[in-house]
A protein has these predicted regions:
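Short linear motifs embedded in intrinsically disordered, charge-biased segments
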Residues: 1-195
């Protein structure tokens, strides 16, 4: 398939200077009409960072940075004595956690990242209470004062389960077939023999 020809059929004109590709194979360079395009190892698509190797740890770190930025922007509200603690907790749940959890349904969370998720949630609550990092205060006492109900990791798990339920309720979909292991074929490439 020629990308340029197919694009022109629907009235699109390609601008090579604005175009990048991320290849899953051995493509190192590409060109259209003699102009060479750039091959990248990662890019932002739909608000998420897509990497060549499919690892989501970069996206998780990126989401924590974005969530931390939102948390910092809310500092003036957290300092206000006119706003009650339950209202501040609801603000964090409504404005910070959704930024962090965006598209978390597709993440493969490892043990180290799970600890980081817990640490970020506790960092948010300690920042909300204005507890300095040097203070010798237990995480349990912080959680007891906030009483968040469900942890950040628990919220992420809930979203994953909701998405899984959505996929399982669909009648005929590729996603459901993949989840149920219904794709026939061999594992591995040419010459891969299993005894």
């Amino acid at each position: 398939m020629n990308v340029k020809v197919e694009s022109e059929k629907v009235g699109l004109k390609l601008n090579i200077q604005k175009m990048n590709i991320m290849a899953s194979g051995p493509i190192t360079s590409w060109e259209i009409d003699g102009e060479t395009g750039e091959t990248v190892s990662d890019f932002i698509f739909g608000g998420s960072k897509i990497t060549e190797d499919g690892d989501c740890s970069h996206e998780i770190k990126r989401r924590f940075l974005l969530g931390g930025k939102v948390m910092t922007n809310l500092d003036s509200i957290f300092k206000s004595r006119d706003i009650t603690l339950p209202s501040k907790v609801r603000l964090v749940k409504a404005m910070v956690f959704p930024v962090v959890m965006y598209r978390c349904e597709s993440w493969t969370v490892k043990k180290a990242e799970r600890r980081t998720i817990d640490a970020f949630g506790l960092w948010c609550w300690r920042r909300l209470l204005r507890v300095p990092w040097t203070a010798r205060r237990s995480n349990q006492s912080t959680l007891k004062q906030i009483s968040p109900g469900i942890s950040l990791e628990g919220m992420m798990l809930k979203l994953k389960l909701q998405y899984f339920g959505h996929l399982m309720r669909r009648v005929d979909s590729l996603e459901k077939t993949l989840m149920l292991g219904g794709i026939e074929g061999r594992a591995g490439g040419e010459g891969d023999e299993r005894g």
